[in-house]
Amino acid sequence: MAKIAILGFGTVGSGVYEVLCRNAAGVSRRAGEPVEVKYILDPKDFSGHPAANLFVKSIDTILQDPEVRVVVETIGGTRFAYPYVKACLESGRSVCTSNKEMVATYGAELLGLAKAHDCAFLFEASVGGGTPIITPMHQCLAANVISEVEGIVNGTTNFMLTNMVRENLSFDDALKVAQELGYAETKDPSDDVDGRDACRKIAILSSMVCGHQIYPQNIPTRGIRAITTADVEAAEKLGCVIKLIAWMKRGKDGSVAAGVEPCLVPKSNQLASVDDVFNAVLVKGDMLGDVVFYGKGAGKLPTASAVVADVVDALKHGSKVHDSLFWQPAEPVDGMLTDPTPAAYYVRVAGIAPAVAEAIYGYGKVVDERYDGCAYFVERADEKALAEAARKVEAVGGSVKLVLKRLPEEA
């Protein structure tokens, strides 16, 4: 019998316990042996819970029990999760986690510990929630050189942007609806709306693709706070919708660029039709071409099911999984991983007339003039040209309020 421990009994942790109880027979059959939860670590009082006898307060209880073979970490963050996970791996216990912040920051180190101590460190749920992407990328796409990954990886912001389009809601009203439905944090939704959640996810995928650690702090990241209903309407005029896109590109020379930013997505692009809390990730391989992974990105039981699938893999394969799921340590780079490739851009400026915007940005067209300024569509520019244009706007008393890159017509 395989004994496991769960660290943290919040939404995902309790979901893992529920999945293991409800689908015990199927999980045990796939693992090749019965799977049983022996401990649940959580400082809160669960004396009234049916599994109250499983709760412990100290990680040492788990570390000192040789029967525990797999540890599920669902605490979140890094303050407690990182040292606990490190100790578990060093003791030869496999770890399965949904903790994107920990994987994005310490992934290379923890993968190295798993290999060194003949165990597994698995994190399928850290990027797609219940939508598989980690396992398909390191197994099914192993014969491909991946050049690009882009997609919608945050269900909260996608739900908000969908409602800003469908219901003509402002950012604040869309956030309020998301909070009322439990899609956004009520106390502090900044990880979602400012793009940090998506940044951690694309950092993990970038590390997998590149074979070395890519850090979130090197990825330019912008959220959706600056999006207005007027921007949504202007996007419609351009045949587009606005989506928060996380992306990475790897050049033939080994160069890496990555980012998280709201973008204009043409309606002919398959990412444009991904709505509500659904996620979609497009992966471009040299042999397979384009493949899309689509599904709900979060939720108690979908996420828990991905974690439990990792538990099964850890029990069946152990450290062998790291023959393909592994990346090397690396130091953070100086500067940001920006993309020098020119693209079309939507720019909203305040404090200057449309004619001035046209003179500064060059070839393009005015999309909207309702502001104290205008919205201008730039046919072709790169990051350097946009930065220079922003300086010129400021020099004549204006300011740049929003910049949105337009994705290609088809992806």
Task: Tell me the role of every PLM-derived stretch.
Residues P34, D188, D192, Q213-T221, ...:
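Flexible, glycine/charged-enriched surface loops at secondary-structure junctions
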Residues I146-E150, N158-L161, V165, Y183-S190, ...:
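Catalytic, metal-anchored helix/loop core of enzyme active sites in primary metabolism
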Residues D173-S273, F278-A280:
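Substrate-binding/catalytic subdomain of NAD(P)-dependent oxidoreductase enzymes
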Residues S94-C96:
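A short hydrophobic/small-residue beta-strand
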Residues A81-A87, S91, K100-H138:
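Rossmann-fold NAD(P)-binding glycine/threonine-rich loop
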Residues V68, K115-D197, I204:
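Rossmann-like NAD(P)H-binding beta-loop-alpha module
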Residues M1-S91:
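N-terminal glycine-/serine-/threonine-rich beta1-alpha1-beta2 phosphate-ribose binding loop
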Residues V311-A411:
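A conserved regulatory-domain signal marking ACT and ACT-like small-molecule sensing domains
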